[in-house]
Amino acid sequence: MDVFKISVDTQQVHKITQENFDQVTKKQAPWYQPINGHQGWFAVCPACDNPIQIIGMLERDAPYGKHFFPTAGAVLVPLKGRVDKEEYEWCPYASKNKHLTKDDRRAAGSELAVLIKQTLIEQFDRVIYLLEKGTGMRISFALAKQMLEEYRAAEGWRYRGATRQNIPWVFAYMMQAKRLRGRIFFDAKFTEELLTRRPDLTWNANGQIDIKDDKKFCDLSFSFIRHRRHVDQYTLSESIEFNIANSKQETVCKREIVFEHDHFLKLINSKNEANRKINLVELARSVLA
């Protein structure tokens, strides 16, 4: 992996460089400590919260992190990560391109699952913001509530592909298909593509997708499918597909949404509370707490 954090309790994620590591750890233990007679650099995996060791900090232009499970007496000062071999097995940095299904579940009492759920509640307005940005579609209060209820029913926080970095997009991935008619789109290019493929539709003055002939039925629905994750060298990338399909399950339009891990983490670590929508946070708490 090419990123690290310094404890389970933080969501501040940093690129692995000597300068960044020194800046956030101030060269203190347990992040700096000897192992096997040599200097060691230790941190926490941002995805699974297990300890990691930084490899090649001084010898390589691009040092990287590797999961590390210390044997008794291997380190003098206990490391900050939470040792959990089961989380490690499904960590995107460990399993790399391992195929996931929604049925792959964490244990009900998983500490990481609890943290994912808690973060979703506390940051729900920012989750909705990023989903609207990625889809070009407004998510109404009513739709947000439906999505929360389906996330609760699916226990989405237990999905093996969920991490604290990808909360907005995995939240959407748990949603069942929803009807398209009446949804407000603000992405003109995507909307024009949809209308070209379905000339029976229109984009009304309110920005809503509607049907030209009120006597006819709009059979289109939208969903989020195909969660994919890939590690190239040491860098993780993830995506899902925003899919619009007809009643024959034929795709009419689709868009790949690449997970913006850095943007999400920047938002949740921001001290600026001015533009937050607390009514959405309260909604999430009422459904999930």
What does each model-identified segment do?
Residues 145-289:
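Intrinsically disordered, low-complexity regulatory regions
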Residues 1-110:
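N-terminal cysteine/histidine-rich coordination modules
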Residues 17, 136-140, 259-262:
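Helix N-terminus capping/helix-initiation residues
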Residues 71-181:
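Domain-exit/linker segments immediately C-terminal to small folded modules
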Residues 5, 15, 26-27, 66, ...:
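Context-gated lysine
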